[in-house]
Amino acid sequence: MKKIYLLITVGFTALSMNSCKKFLEQPSVTKYDSQNIFETVDRAEMVVVGCYSQIFNRELYYQLGMGTDECMSTESTSNSKNQVGNYVYTPSISPSSTFTAMYAGIEYANVAIKGLQGMSVSDAQKPKLNMLLGEAYAIRAMNYLNLIRFFGDVPYSTEPVGETGQFSSSRVNRDVIYDGCIKDLQTAAGLLPWKSAGMVPTYERFTKQAALGILARVALYAAGYSLRWDLNTYSAASVKIAQRPDASRIKELYKIAADACKQVMDKGENSLLPNFETVFRNLITSKYDNESMLLFGQWGQDNNDSQVGYTNGIFAHASCIYGKSQPAMAVTPTYWYDFAAGDLRRDVTICNYGINADNGRDMNTYSSNTIGKFRVNWGPNTGTAVNKRDIDWPILRYSDILLMYAEALNEYNNAPTGEARAALEQVRTRGFGGDASKIGVTPSDYQGFRNAIINERKFEFGFESLRRTDLERWGILYETLTKTKQNLNEMAGVTGAYANIDRYRVYKRTIATSFQDAVVAVPYTGYKTLTPADSTTMAKAGNVVLRMHNASILNSQGTLAPNNALISNLFRGLEREKVEILPIATSIIDVNPGLKGQQHPKY
């Protein structure tokens, strides 16, 4: 009898053609004889579907999604999530859930790949077997990407631990891992069907276009900057931000990224929805669309642990009709003003109100705006529970294909081509409601276009857990966050670029009455100055007069004043050529002898 592997079995739920009813229930962990589980394609499919439970977790958008020019923590400075979100790392508090989850998924994928490769099936079953094998390759590669994004060089294995008997593994050069991931994703793309083939029932599983999109993402990271050190000496003096040393391979990687995106674009199965708002209303109400290309499924009591919409949503009072939503993440105040006038993405991405106990919409002040993309009042109901809202996580959207394509062409050619400009403009025009006259002039030089991409990704993917490591792969994390903190002080003091911002906003309070709420933002009139008499008159007329630098009455993060605690605590651990990569948690090193002496050299 062959070795016993730890596998995951999965039960399927019914699928709806127009609704994203979840394709999996919570897996139950069971021991199976590997010979028996891979006897039939249907049994093997359970193993592959089980891999998806370990491709994402809350840490990826929570601790590791904060600390950017978009997002900050709302928790106390003594809280480990706040510390990680502000670059106050130590090996004792370094996030470990992502590390262990990604390796669990890799082990499941390795088991699946080995088992599937050993199967003999009929010609009629071969396409499905290929699809399953492609999924396993893609999952393994994506999990390694998430490990490298945050931990740099990590242990690397493509064989099941149960097969090799190796429970000790050292760090492997990330360039070797990236090249392995690219090979895996190229293999996956060759095996997987397009969504239109009808074989993949949901965007919560890999299709050919999803594999190509993740291939492009991996290639851009592999070509980009990262914090590196000498893996022979682990000398602190060797730590530096750099690209991989082989310039020809870097150029090849940009071509790989561009070509992968072009395949998706040329196929024509995916497209931008006309309205940015619809993307997230569909997500929250579990509807499929052609823009969402890969989602992490959340449904029911057992497979719903990411707390999307609860940890990273708007504030909703426990007594309101929507049930409690208690965000532990807030909007970096300057982000609001980063958006250009007329960019409709701002009010979808940033919610300017919370829901009080009486269901009233109370406007937020600058310090307390919340994440709007996953707001609970847009859902069809409360969901499974207030902290299990049944909201999928968006891993890949078509707009990312367009922006990665534009970026890769600019890097490959050292200047934007016409195709690169057109791809960027397609995303930007949608952001302005389809009005191309509002998007401004697209730069035609390399650096100007690169800066445009850096900004556009901020506007398009706010709070989708891409910004932090995007800034790192561009080599500008420290510089961007240092500038953000300077801007925040100017905003607090109403000086410099923020000299003419609103000090007051006046609005009418309205009452929410149902789920699938049509409201996007509370309308207001902004004022630079208001006399006490004017304020009194407006209040008597039924308006609320809000001092924008004061604390909010809901989800308060305190006042916004120059150099106060809100500002001084933000990014307080930031240190160039140190915090771009996290230390590996002590608890992980303790159980892996291969990592002894291989901690991040500056920790």
Where are the language model's segments positioned?
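Short edge-strand/loop segments of extracellular domains
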Residues: 72, 160-164, 262, 422-433
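Bacterial Sec-dependent N-terminal signal peptides
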Residues: 3-5, 13-40, 181, 216, ...
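TPR/Sel1-like alpha-solenoid repeat signature
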Residues: 137, 212-218
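Acidic, serine/threonine/proline-rich low-complexity intrinsically disordered regions
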Residues: 158-161, 171, 226-255, 393-397, ...
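Elongated scaffold/linker segments in the mid-to-C-terminal portions of large proteins
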Residues: 36, 41-42, 48, 52, ...
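Short coil/turn linking the two alpha-helices of tandem helical-hairpin repeats
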Residues: 148-150, 155, 196, 218-230, ...
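Short, surface-exposed recognition loops and adjoining beta-strand edges that mediate ligand/DNA contacts
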Residues: 61-74, 193-210, 224-314, 434-452, ...
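Conserved, well-structured interaction surfaces
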Residues: 39-49, 53-57, 79-151, 165-201, ...
